Amino acid sequence: MEDKEIGTPLPLPHSEARLQPTLVLTTLSAAFGSVFQYGYNIAVINTPHKVFKSFYNDTHFERHGTFMDESTLLLLWSCTVSMFPLGGLLGSLVVGLMVNKWGRKGTLLINNVFAITSAVLMGVSKVARAFELIILSRVLVGICAGIAYSTLPMYLGELAPQNLRGALGTMTEVFVIIGVLLAQIFSLQAILGNATGWPILLALTGVPAVIQLLSLPFFPESPRYTLIEKGDEETARQALRRLRGQNYNVEAEMEEMRTEERTEQAEGRLSVLNLFTFRPLRWQLISIVVLMAGQQLSGINAVNYYADVIYTSAGVDPTQSQYVTLGSGVINLVMTLVSAVIIERLGRRILLLSGYAICCSACLVLTVALLLQSTAPELSYLSIVCVFSYIVGHSIGPSPVPSVVRTEIVLQSSRTAAFTVDGAVHWLTNFIVGLTFPSIQVAIGAYSFLVFAGVCILTAAYIYVVIPETKGRTFVEINCAFAKRNGVEFPEEKEVATAKPHTPSLPTKETAF
């Protein structure tokens, strides 16, 4: 099949790919050994924080004969908490170099060094009587999480067939939440969240890393990376056959990747600095920044931080609030799985917009309930409903969907640079919220949730105006949709509209798509 005007062979129509065992197992191995670490280490120190502080204090007494004053203990604990997102930021800054040199799968495997090292250090910290090992390990496991959170969506997005790209893309957030939930379960006082069990609790972060080291080498590297960046067409074809099944015609997908490769030959590999000045990717880059900043600044971490106070004000016994928190974690996981099921039916935009609408409404009602519950105590129960509603809203859109969209709106040659920016924004905003929210909450109290409602409105407005629906489109077609907004001429746009499911060839030098 050939376009007579351009003389470029066009790819055959895509058939619907079915979910194959190899693709499922690759996803499980890659996700469990990577972003699971992110979720687990976010939550693992929250419930038993008094146990850790006691260890810090006892260690100080053994060394100096006196206990720490409250300000010193608070400073050390703040360092323990904040070192994780700081490590995540460091990891996100090196991920571009790693995935270009060692590939997506290779980067995930090398990344396990950070997880295993931190697990060993945290596991022996009690025997060594050195709380400093915990703080150092939080940096290392943060680096692991930062690398994983940028690499896994890239890997899964490039492994997935077009009709399953959304569902597989949400697995990044699904496994983050599974990590959070298991950490909440294991850190219960009756299990490992106690004075004797906490070293094991922290060291468990090494188990997924070992499992991945033993399993992931047997699964294929990203076919797009193999073909477009390494030029190894036969290995890419073999990988596609393993991922799609032997009865699937992989040639249409191979031709689509060749088309993408041709569009990028004039562009070359973009660095992070070049990305900021590259006109054809201007709105894609802005969209990535808005999606990741909106995800964090919309208040999910603040709601989790404030949840225990809300539960206590509603009459929940402080010793039982850990179980209410566990219940919210279950809701989070269930709704994220629902998002994974419906994303290819409803699309990305509707999940993002409806999710932000729910979050905004929950923040507004929560503000009113918190302000009035001193005069109307029954409103404290409404506060709990608002927390759970917020979690539902964030779980169906703002949490899982950006991982899908950020992979889809950039092409292969710019993806690593874009994900470096993406990861840096994610971890920096995460760090800012964790650092500033306690002070904001003290200063303005319940009104702090109005700030998050405003962020939800602004982010949703941007998505509505700027970000197109990406469901069912190839990577090249999605970038064509951004062309007019970027002020770039695409002579093939008419062909895309009239000749679907053909994928256009884009040889124009200026567009570099």
Swiss-Prot record:
Membrane topology, record value: Multi-pass membrane protein
The glycosylation sites annotated in the UniProt record are 57
- UniProt KW Transmembrane helix keyword: yes
**Where does this protein chiefly localize?**
membrane
Give me the segments passing through the membrane: 22-42, 79-99, 108-128, 139-159, 173-193, 199-219, 283-303, 323-343, 352-372, 381-401, 417-437, 447-467
Topological domains on the Extracellular side lie at 43-78, 129-138, 194-198, 304-322, 373-380, 438-446
Tell me which GO cellular component terms the UniProt record holds: apical plasma membrane; plasma membrane
Reaction(s) catalysed by this chain's protein: D-glucose(out) = D-glucose(in); D-fructose(out) = D-fructose(in)
Positions on the Cytoplasmic side per record topology:
1-21, 100-107, 160-172, 220-282, 344-351, 402-416, 468-513
Keywords associated with the record: Cell membrane, Glycoprotein, Membrane, Sugar transport, Transmembrane, Transmembrane helix, Transport
- Matching CDD domains, A to Z? MFS_GLUT_Class2
Q: Per its UniProt record, what Gene3D superfamilies does this chain match? A: MFS general substrate transporter like domains (1.20.1250.20)
* Family as reported in the entry's similarity comment: Belongs to the major facilitator superfamily. Sugar transporter (TC 2.A.1.1) family. Glucose transporter subfamily.
Q: What's the protein here called?
A: Solute carrier family 2, facilitated glucose transporter member 7
Organism, scientific name: Mus musculus
- Organism placement in taxonomy: Eukaryota, Metazoa, Chordata, Craniata, Vertebrata
Gene symbol here is: Slc2a7
